């Protein structure tokens, strides 16, 4: 289960997931929860319960920290499974620089608070721009927005302005739009949507 889901941002209550994991475990199964987009809303995380009742939590470093090229992820789980994963992955599953950068970023709690506030403000600003341009925001997280539209048409329109969006093969009527960075990017997005 992906929580928040990608690409629609739909969230599942943590209590439900913990209960589901217990039910899975009682039948000999696991519940794997991918929390790649969870850093923007830590209250959604079931990581504190990882290892209980067959619950495995996967976390991805690059999304929240904006370091997509840094290949770093985590499996939070019971010790026996952790040891099996460690054995399967070998001694150098993650590079030394990735570990160092990841550790520094994870420990910088002040930056986490700032980033969450900044992302939320930018998400609200993008929502206002999209709605003013006549687009319906149908989902997303504080990292991206999902709009209901002719995805291919708007994707081409935005690409013509050098703005990359994400289309989906499974649905031609949605498009994912990332948050602009600086004021120049915001101006370019507004102009491309006009």
Regions found by a protein language model. Give the residues of each.
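Short amphipathic alpha-helical segments
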Residues: 70, 141-143, 173-175
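Conserved PLP-binding catalytic core of the aspartate aminotransferase-like
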Residues: 119-120, 130-161, 179
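PLP-dependent aminotransferase class I/II
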Residues: 54-131, 135-137
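Alpha-helical scaffolding segments of alpha/beta enzyme cores, especially the outer helices
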Residues: 15, 19-22, 121, 125, ...
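Conserved PLP-binding active-site segment of the aspartate aminotransferase-like
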Residues: 146-150, 159-194
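Short beta-strands and strand-loop turn motifs
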Residues: 1-5, 32-34, 138-140, 168
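Active-site pre-lysine segment of PLP-dependent enzymes
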Residues: 7-67
